[in-house]
Amino acid sequence: RRQRQMCIRDSSRGALNIPGYRPAGIYSAGTAQRLVNMEGFMPGREVVILGSGDIGLIMARRMTLEGAKVKVVSELMPYSGGLKRNIVQCLDDYGIPLKLSHTVVDIKGKERLEGVTLAEVDQKGKPIPGTEEFYSCDTLLLSVGLIPENEISGGMGVEMNPVTSGPKVNESLETNIEGVFACGNVLHVHDLVDFVSEEAASAGKNAAAYVREGDRLENEKEIVLNPVEGVRYTVPGTICVNRMDEKLTVRFRVGGVFKNCYVSAYFDEERVIHRKRQVVAPGEMEQIQLTKEMLLKYPDLKTITVKIEEA
């Protein structure tokens, strides 16, 4: 029996529309990671990294340990896309500067990369004239986001979430197509492999139960999860109380950096969860725990709204 595996891939330079020629020396951070770690090949000696995702941050440290000079990490957004601990351990500990609200506006070199020009950007992401700064380098690494590979899922008719580029799933991690389950980075991009393992175990258990028993609760009422006010999405997107386990983890990401705030969940109009956080950021996945006992107290519940509230 043939099997197909889906995963995630790096965004490419073509998706960024960076002006300039296409010289050698421009790699995705994932490609550079494979070259260094598995092939024993050094892509270059003077490095600029565009994007501050976790792979890019880790490669900044890795290239430094291999003897390269990482001159700067540039991030388009006003915040880093990686974990705080990776910023500290991979950049701060090695004296590598991180320029927020900056991007590459020009590439110099025809055959081989000779340097890149960075510029500060405004709130709309447009370069600000007069802020250009040139960095000589022979290597540019792109850490500008990961894309779940869902071509097979889409071809099957699986409904996709435009925010995550992954399938929409219910509490069992089942898609809109009966018997098709999704988990891991093909569902939404994770920062910790622990969460991937938990999702995989849950999806596998639910898929096995479906094979044994079928979808016995096909017409059961579902509760819709509604992400608003700083929350970009939730996984899962719907919940059937009678089908869920005793505990359910709802994972989500925020759309900006929020300090001294609360993560709140409203059951229709009633606030049930109100958890204090010192800081939440897009680079770190958040989660709340729901229990079947909690949901059974609200038999007419239609919507669970997840939001970020100011202290």
Model-assigned labels for residue ranges:
Residues 3-8:
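Short, small-residue-biased leader/transition segments that mark boundaries at the very start
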Residues 263-265, 293-311:
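Short, aromatic- and glycine-rich surface loops/edge beta-strands on solvent-exposed regions
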Residues 64-151, 246-278:
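A Rossmann-like FAD-binding core segment of flavoenzymes
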Residues 194, 202, 206-275:
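Mid-to-C-terminal Rossmann-like scaffold of FAD/NAD(P)H-dependent oxidoreductases
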Residues 27-36, 138-190:
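FAD-site-proximal beta/loop scaffold in flavoenzymes
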Residues 9-19, 147-156:
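Flavin (primarily FAD) binding-site architecture
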